[in-house]
Regions:
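Positively charged n-region of N-terminal signal peptides that target proteins for export
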Residues: 1-8
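C-terminal motif of bacterial Sec signal peptides marking the signal peptidase cleavage site
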Residues: 14-18
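Bacterial signal peptide processing site
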Residues: 20-23
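Extracytoplasmic/secreted envelope proteins and their assembly/folding machinery
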Residues: 32-35, 56, 82, 93, ...
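Short, compositionally biased low-complexity segments enriched in polar/charged residues
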Residues: 48-80, 91-96, 124-125
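Second-shell loop/turn segments in exported
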Residues: 81-89, 135-140
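Short Gly/Thr-rich strand-loop-strand
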Residues: 90-132
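A short, solvent-exposed beta-edge/loop patch
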Residues: 119-157
Length: 157
């Protein structure tokens, strides 16, 4: 009888585990919370200023308007910046990620040719571009350890 109880319990556990379904979608980043944490992390050497919301799509080359966005750019003519975008869905976020990657590539190519701020070239080459759910994050900074601590340390929703 004891063996039968153990066997039935094991079968019930296997059946319940099979009903688990798909893993949840990755949580996105909250633009306000994440941008504040990044700005306070010490990751940036240059003074940053928030970009007007109506300029975000044109600045980053986005096809679709984000539902929410926080974008900061360098006031010093440098390339340090951060952007956290909330898009309508994961497909729109994937398209936004592609546009953001193209934005970083264009800036890298420009700096390689012009050498206006050569000290920023390594920052551009190490830029962080991530998609989490329906959000996209871009960070061009001086301290990527600080960036990683924020993005990997629980600032996601």
């Amino acid at each position: 009888m004891k063996k039968l109880t153990v066997l039935l319990t094991a079968l019930a556990l296997v059946a319940l585990a099979a009903c688990g379904g798909k893993a949840p979608a990755p949580a996105g980043y909250d633009p306000e919370t994440t941008s504040k944490a990044l700005l306070e992390s010490g990751a940036f050497e240059q003074e940053l200023s928030q970009l007007d919301a109506d300029m975000v799509s044109a600045y980053l080359g986005l096809e679709d308007e984000p539902e929410a966005a926080v974008v900061y750019t360098s006031l010093e003519g440098g390339y340090e910046e951060l952007a956290i975008l909330t898009m309508a869905d994961e497909d729109a976020a994937a398209a936004a990620k592609t546009a953001v990657e193209a934005h970083v590539t264009a800036q890298t190519e420009t700096e390689t040719e012009v050498q206006y701020k050569p000290e920023d070239l390594p920052k551009l080459k190490d830029a962080v571009v991530r998609q989490a759910g329906n959000t996209v994050v871009l960070v061009v900074a001086a301290d990527y350890d600080a960036v990683g601590a924020v993005l990997d340390g629980g600032s996601a929703e």
